[in-house]
Every structure is written in C-alpha cells, then in structure tokens.
Amino acid sequence: MAGFKLKVTPEMESLTQVCVENSKMDPSLYGKYDVKRGLRDVNGKGVLAGLTQISSICSTDVVDGKTVPCEGRLYYRGYDIHELTQGFLREQRFGFEEVTYLLLFGKLPNEKELADFKVLLAGQRSLPKNFVRDVIMKAPTKDMMNTLSRSVLTLYAYDHNADDTSLPNVLRQCLNLISVFPMLSVYSYQAYNHYIKGKSLYIHNPDPKLSVAENILLMLRPDMQYTQLEATILDLALVLHMEHGGGNNSTFTTHVVTSSGTDTYSAVAAALGSLKGPKHGGANIKVVQMFKDMKKQVKDWTDEEEVGAYLRALLHKEAFDKKGLIYGMGHAVYSISDPRAEIFKGFVQKLAHEKGKDKDFALYSMVEQLAPKIIGEERHIYKGVSANVDFYSGFVYSMLDLPTELFTPMFAIARIVGWSAHRMEELINMDKIIRPAYKTVKKEEIYRPLEER
C-alpha cells in the first residue's frame, strides 16, 4: 500500500522515547492522590462506577463483623448460575436462548415465550445479500476479532435506521447481532483458513431448527457432524461466558460508549476492541499454550513433584513465556473458587473421556490442586487462589476442534448478550455521558518561542 509504512523506523524509535520520557509518571503519585486506576482498593472493592440489575458477583461474606473470602457466587438477574444451568441441563435442553431472554428482559420465559423467542432469533439469523462474499471473503486477516469488528461496523451501512437509539430499535439491532455473531465468527475463520492458510473453503448455512451451539459446530465442521455432548458443553460454555457484571472491561466500555449517544454498531465494535486485548479475552489461549509446553517439559504427567517443579519454574520466570504467571489461576474478584469453573469441570471430564483425553484431564486436575499451594508459598499470597473459567475453557475448545483463532470470538458470541443487556440498561436509566475525572500532575510550563527552544 503506497504511503502506508509497515516498518518501525529508527525515527519512530526515537520519537517513542521522547513520548515515554515526557509521559511517564511516578507510581507513588497514585497512592498520594488515592487513585485506584480502575483496580481494587485495599478492601477488595472495585471502583464504584454505576448500578446494575443484570448480574452480580459475590466472593466474600461478613462473619462476626469481618469480611472473609467465600465460595464464589454468580447471579444472572438474581438467579444463581448453578441453579440456572442445572435447570436446563437436568431437562436436557440447551440454555443459550433461555438465558439470553433472562438477561435481556429480566425474567425467565415460560414455554410459549421461549418458543417464540427461539423463532425470533432464528428469523434474525441471516446476513445481507452478498455480505459474506463482499465483506468477509475480501481482505481476510489473521485475527478474527479484527475481522469481526470490521463486519459489525460494515453492518451499519446496511441498516437504514442505524443511528436511531430508541429502545425498540436498539433491541432490534442487538437481537440481530446476537443472532449473526456465530455466522460472522465462523465465516471469518473459514475465509482466513482458505485464503491465508490455503485450506479448503466451507460455508454452511445455519439451521433455524438448531440451537446456537449446534449451529456453530455445524457451520465450522466440513462434515457438519457433532455429538450431543459436544453441543451441550459448548452451549454451557457460552452461557457461562455471557455476563460477568458491569465492571469488566468490555462491558464497562459498552456503558461508556453507549452514554455518548452513539449507535449500536459502534458501541459493540468498541466492546470487541476491549475483549480482543490479551488481558481480557485471550487468557484461555495462554492456558492451552502453557499446557502444551508443560507436556513437553514434564516427562511423567502423573508425578506431582515433577509437575510442581514446572509450576515453580513458571513463577520464577524460567518456563514457558517467562512472565511469572500460571495461566488460568486466580481472578480479580474470586479467591476461593470461580463458580463458572466449578460448573464446567464435571462436563470437561465427560468430554475428555469421550475424546480419549483422560490423561490430559488428569494433568489439568493435578495443576488445579497444586498451583494454589505453590502460588501461596512462592508469592506469599494467602487470601486464596483458585482456577478460573479460562483454566478449562481452552481445553474444552481444543477438544471440540475449535481453532485457537476462534477462542476469543467464542467469548464474543456469548458476551454480546451481556453487552446488549447493559446497553439497554444504560439507555433506560441514564441520560448523562460518563466522564470520569483524571488528576493532572504535570506542572505548568513557560512557553518559549520556536527560535529559543
């Protein structure tokens, strides 16, 4: 591309250094001015930025007047996630559509409401004429999140009421995006797989009679075949990733951008940009890569001493990516347990058995047991560290033959539901733009004419 510089030149390096020298701040200033930088305070509470009825997270109880860690709890619209998932699993139903209804409308649907809602979503599950050919197939990229963002922003051009932020219109847009996100994600991967990796191209139309999870597997696989267990566990994964409070980075982004009065497509694209970040949406990829390295370095996967030595090497920055982290362990809110991981684990074991991956599952289980103790000893952390949902989700996606390029888009397919609910909530309750304050710590300077500098 003429005029578009693709290389970092020495000039760019030099200018970057000037930027760093004049932008770096003394870390002690954050403590001086009691600035939390959007993080947890000394009492473990987040910086309170708003109110929500959509979901809540509980990781502590008050016992004898003292706040103590407890088993993690997650509620969708006031319903415990354990009870929600057990409800549809016990009745051998897929839960994506039911929980989507709950998060958007604040109540559980009855049989007729759920049946009608499924028909509504299925009816929205189509893209504009030639969209796949003209938008997705042209200029495919190696990053599916960027392709997904581009597709969402392009859909703006096909919507004659794109800028209308009335509640019925925003709901229409959100339901349409929820319905087409699986298509956008899978088709983007198929384009990448064909045009960049040179593999065969498969474009399968979704089946309106099937659930979201079933359609993802149908569209992704050349033979369109899948087992009931595969579809069930993918559906469960999507439900567990749908929502996690208004304070997570991408959902807060949705609130902030929505408060400006912008259109739905721009708000969702902004949330996608947030989720793409490896500190938010890419953790499960790191877990899979870490275990791949572990399997190469550890000769006996059943030897706790050898596995423990590898985990200590991770913390000492001597193994894998040398970042000093055991990926999939620990969470910003949960300490004793992540309820999503607890729900997930039993089904992971069933899928591992079906796929002949019992030894792999045993290794994951061993790491889950050893890591908290080792982290506590090495880092002197005694508040509690446990496996989070990312610890098992990457393993599940790998067993489902989902390519790593689709790991974060799977997160987006689920979280678009939560983003939509929060966008509606912001529009219903707020009419002010979110504008947090920043403390200026730069001293005033005297202006000098150009010839005197």
Summary of predicted features, one role per range:
Residues 2-453:
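Non-transmembrane, aqueous-exposed alpha-helical and coiled segments at domain scale
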